[in-house]
């Protein structure tokens, strides 16, 4: 569903979580790009509560990394309930446990999933 600027302002979301099935869109794109200046008064943008999902192929809605997707949405929507969890650390442990990879390999996987923003924002 594509929303107009007017529809977005009518909703005025507290949080925006960007999907990645049609291409990756980092939170910084909405927060910093002049292409989105008309949206700067939205609560989510003013409060810097814009997040991006991990990259996922269009045909993989229920892949093994699905718990990461759920955690990002939960922490974005309810930061006070998940303040003790850092997604960037959870992701490393997840990859090590699920795939049996080293710390360095887990970091490479996190980067491939385009989740380095979680480190940058300490999310």
Report the location of each language-model feature.
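N-terminal ligand-binding lobe of clamshell/alpha-beta domains
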Residues: 1-123
């Amino acid at each position: 569903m594509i929303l107009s600027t007017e529809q977005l302002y009518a909703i005025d979301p507290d949080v925006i979580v960007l999907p990645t099935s049609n291409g990756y869109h980092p939170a910084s794109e909405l927060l910093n790009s002049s292409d989105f200046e008309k949206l700067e008064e939205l609560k989510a943008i003013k409060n810097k509560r814009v997040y991006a999902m991990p990259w996922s192929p269009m045909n993989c809605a229920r892949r093994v990394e699905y718990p990461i997707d759920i955690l990002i949405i939960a922490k974005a929507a309810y930061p006070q309930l998940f303040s003790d969890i850092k997604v960037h650390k959870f992701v490393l442990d997840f990859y090590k446990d699920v795939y049996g990879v080293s710390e360095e390999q887990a970091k490479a996987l996190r980067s491939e999933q385009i989740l380095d923003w979680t480190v940058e924002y300490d999310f």
